[in-house]
């Protein structure tokens, strides 16, 4: 039986509310001063299986009563063999659920673990209910560091002798031929503190030589924790406010501060054109909240979290900041979390994982480039950082600020409906800086005049001109979301599903499949739209583009930035720094070159194969294409110089391409939201994907169809259909798409599937995951 605390949690979760401090009897306070000692703890065991996705009650040893709180990572005896397992405390109390003599005792606190706050435990519970994950999966998500990391210790040998005693000790050691001891004592003449590493490596000392000197009172060993990662001594000192805000920026700051100072905690959407100075606004909002002693989380997509970006915040806030990114080692990440947990920093900057920073006095969460797909987790729990940030802000009484030049349709619709406060920035921040002039190059017309080059005539001429003037250019390969679709080189149209309006995917060499409804046709030899024989799968790569550009412009200095060239630690920074220092004329890359970078020397951006992402089998393909093209175009003309952009496409008439060329978000939004309403896609409805996986194909088919029949009684269902990769490691996979009006219905759907699974033993072999759009 569950403890009262977990029962109460379940009751609140059923009403789509996270448990509150007043209504849930968890006693989850972090500070131990004056708090009663509990006898029992409810613990989730660190085993990823639904059958143990419940708390187990353990007795708290008297000697650990003051150390264990909600969120503490502990080791406990588990199962018939009482093998030691890791678990997380999710509740505490003084009432035994069954015979106290049968309740096992906590073995100890896990080495190197940090106690997460009660707020994060409640957030994990909310994520469990929202995304259909196990409590163990959500707890692992909110815990600071997955690996058990030890602090890096720095040991120093400190001399305890005065000068006279030191000389006498040297003479005594020389007489007894203690050569190693003599080397160390002589080193103490110049420095009373010798790093242990230096003593062992340079002086060739062993612990056997050091211990007797310590026992005789000649030296002591000082131990300190050494921070891994950034060398704060080399960072720029904070300079305070250095940028004067324009009227639009100041209006956005004033609106936020007015609400903040009156106690209103809202969600704000800063919609600013590329180069409008959203970062300066973020820093002003952060400064206001920090003045009250509050803490701030700033989420930035991993791809944009470059040295250049980080330094902008260090110049303003100094070492109040901790940074997270995937290029940090596990030890470096551990140190950053420890700094946050101890209150040594007030700002955590990083990708979506930074959302779970152990801040107890959170005042503001900012999400830069809130439209980015990187904020959606692709593993369980399949959460979206924007949704989880809203819940964490609610739990902590913090404000939430979203920012983007190309907001997600979900966020912009909420702003239009009054759920978010819209803060527009219509103009570029730098005086005299204007949006670039954009031209669309129709690649169908290029082919008709015999130009089979990857460069249109317009882009070729502009590149030649820029190189002659000593200016820089960026060539962007739009490969985000690339899949093996089929398109016509003559008319530019991709082969789409007649039922779902998404591109068909090429399977093998001769079969086209829709991954939404399962529609299948053989690969045709002629374009169904224009009859042209020039129809085939589409493929492109940055490496081939680099080779072609070097042949076409042999004197140009060229850099390439993609997954291959940035694989090593520091690879991003090295390439971006070289380009910023004018060590190259042309930078070629995928979306990582267009994410928030500011290069004053760039006056031309060429976007190659702009419609690649239009042809992905996803109802969001037009939205993602518009976002990428707009972000890429925004890199040109940022330092007062006029900028040009050339968009090369086989579908110049598409509204996403036209709106991106016009840098007009409202134009795109009006078209796209009508499309979503027409086909009943989010954000005008709620949509979920239920993933079924099983090693027995027949069982998979039967169970997936059984679920679809049951769910069609209460919701619109599409499928089940084979997953894009149907078989992985001998496991077959199918997807069932569900559309409904409210999130509450999705919660009921999970309950219905669980009821089905509990009633039939066939389901024991089927794994189920949920993905909420």
Enumerate the language-model features and the residues they cover.
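A general secondary-structure signal for short beta-strands and their flanking turns/coil
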Residues: 38-40, 53, 82, 470, ...
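Accessory, non-ATPase domains that flank or precede helicase/AAA+ motor cores in DNA-metabolism machines
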Residues: 2-404, 416-430, 706, 737, ...
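Outer-membrane beta-barrel proteins
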Residues: 112, 678, 724-726
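Short beta-strand elements
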Residues: 559, 714-723, 764-772
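Inter-lobe coupling/hinge segments of SF2-like helicase ATPases
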Residues: 240-246, 250, 254, 264-701, ...
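C-terminal structured "cap/appendage" subdomains that terminate the fold
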Residues: 707-743, 749
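Short coil/turn motifs at beta-sheet boundaries
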Residues: 36, 51, 69, 177, ...
């Amino acid at each position: 039986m569950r403890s009262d605390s977990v029962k109460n949690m379940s009751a609140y979760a059923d009403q789509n509310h996270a448990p509150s401090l007043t209504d849930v009897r968890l006693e989850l306070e972090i500070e131990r001063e004056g708090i009663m000692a509990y006898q029992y703890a409810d613990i989730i065991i660190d085993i990823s299986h639904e059958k143990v996705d419940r708390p187990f009650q353990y007795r708290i040893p008297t000697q650990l009563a003051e150390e264990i709180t909600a969120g503490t990572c502990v080791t406990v005896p588990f199962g018939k063999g009482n093998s030691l397992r890791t678990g997380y405390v999710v509740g505490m109390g003084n009432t035994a659920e069954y015979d106290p003599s049968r309740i096992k005792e906590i073995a100890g606190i896990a080495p190197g673990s940090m106690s997460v706050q009660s707020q994060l435990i409640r957030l994990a519970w909310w994520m469990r209910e929202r995304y259909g994950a196990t409590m163990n999966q959500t707890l692992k998500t909110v815990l600071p560091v997955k690996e058990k990391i030890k602090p890096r210790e720095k040991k120093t040998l400190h001399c305890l002798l005065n000068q006279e005693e030191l000389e006498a000790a040297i003479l005594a050691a020389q007489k007894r031929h203690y050569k190693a001891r003599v080397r160390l004592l002589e080193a103490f003449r110049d420095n009373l503190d010798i790093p242990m590493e230096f003593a062992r490596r340079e002086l060739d000392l062993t612990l056997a030589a050091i211990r007797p000197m310590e026992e005789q009172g000649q030296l002591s060993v000082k131990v300190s924790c050494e921070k891994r990662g950034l060398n704060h001594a080399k960072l720029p000192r904070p300079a305070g406010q250095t940028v004067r805000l324009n009227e639009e920026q100041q209006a956005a700051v004033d609106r936020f501060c007015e609400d903040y100072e009156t106690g209103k905690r809202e969600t704000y959407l800063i919609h600013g054109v590329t180069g409008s100075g959203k970062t300066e606004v973020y820093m002003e909002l952060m400064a206001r909240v920090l003045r009250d002693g509050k803490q701030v989380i700033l989420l930035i997509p991993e791809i944009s979290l470059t040295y250049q970006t980080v330094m902008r915040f260090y110049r303003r806030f100094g070492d109040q900041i901790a940074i997270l990114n995937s290029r940090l080692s596990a030890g470096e990440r551990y140190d950053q979390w420890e700094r946050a947990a101890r209150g040594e920093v007030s700002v955590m900057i990083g990708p979506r994982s930074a959302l779970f920073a152990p801040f107890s006095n959170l005042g503001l969460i900012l999400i830069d480039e809130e439209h980015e797909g990187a904020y959606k987790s692709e593993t369980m729990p399949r959460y979206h950082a924007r949704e989880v940030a809203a819940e964490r802000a609610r739990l902590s009484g913090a404000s939430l600020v979203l920012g983007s030049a190309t907001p997600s349709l979900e966020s912009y619709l909420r702003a239009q409906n009054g759920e978010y406060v819209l803060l527009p920035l219509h103009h570029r921040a730098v005086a005299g800086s204007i949006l670039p002039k954009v031209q669309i190059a129709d690649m169908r017309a290029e082919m008709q005049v015999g130009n089979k080059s990857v460069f249109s005539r317009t882009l070729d001429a502009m590149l030649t001109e820029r190189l002659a003037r000593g200016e820089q250019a960026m060539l962007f390969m739009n490969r985000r979301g690339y899949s093996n679709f089929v398109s016509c080189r003559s008319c530019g149209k991709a082969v789409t599903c007649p039922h779902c309006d998404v591109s068909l995917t090429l399977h093998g060499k001769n079969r086209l499949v829709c991954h939404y409804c399962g529609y299948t046709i053989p690969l045709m030899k002629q374009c169904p739209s224009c009859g042209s024989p020039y129809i085939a799968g589409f493929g492109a790569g940055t490496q081939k583009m680099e080779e072609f550009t070097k042949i076409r412009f042999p004197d140009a200095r060229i850099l390439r930035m993609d997954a291959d060239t940035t694989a090593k630690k520091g690879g991003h920074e090295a390439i971006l720094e070289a380009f910023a220092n004018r060590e190259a004329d042309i930078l070629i890359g995928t979306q990582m070159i267009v994410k928030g970078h500011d290069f004053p020397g760039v006056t031309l951006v060429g976007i190659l194969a702009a419609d690649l992402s239009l042809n992905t089998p996803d109802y969001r393909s037009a939205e993602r294409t518009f976002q990428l093209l707009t972000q890429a175009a925004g890199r040109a003309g940022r330092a007062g110089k006029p900028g040009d952009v050339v968009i090369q496409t086989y579908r110049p008439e598409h509204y996403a391409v036209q709106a991106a060329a016009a840098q007009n978000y409202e134009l795109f939004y009006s078209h796209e939201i009508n499309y979503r309403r027409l086909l009943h896609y989010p954000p005008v409805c709620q949509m979920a994907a239920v993933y079924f996986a099983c090693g027995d194909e027949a069982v998979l088919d039967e169970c997936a169809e059984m679920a679809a029949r049951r769910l069609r009684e209460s919701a619109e269902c599409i499928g089940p259909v084979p997953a894009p990769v149907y078989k992985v490691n001998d496991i077959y996979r199918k997807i069932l798409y569900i559309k409904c009006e409210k999130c509450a219905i999705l919660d009921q759907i999970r309950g219905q599937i669980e009821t089905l699974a509990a009633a039939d033993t066939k389901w024991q072999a089927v794994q189920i995951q949920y993905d909420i759009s």
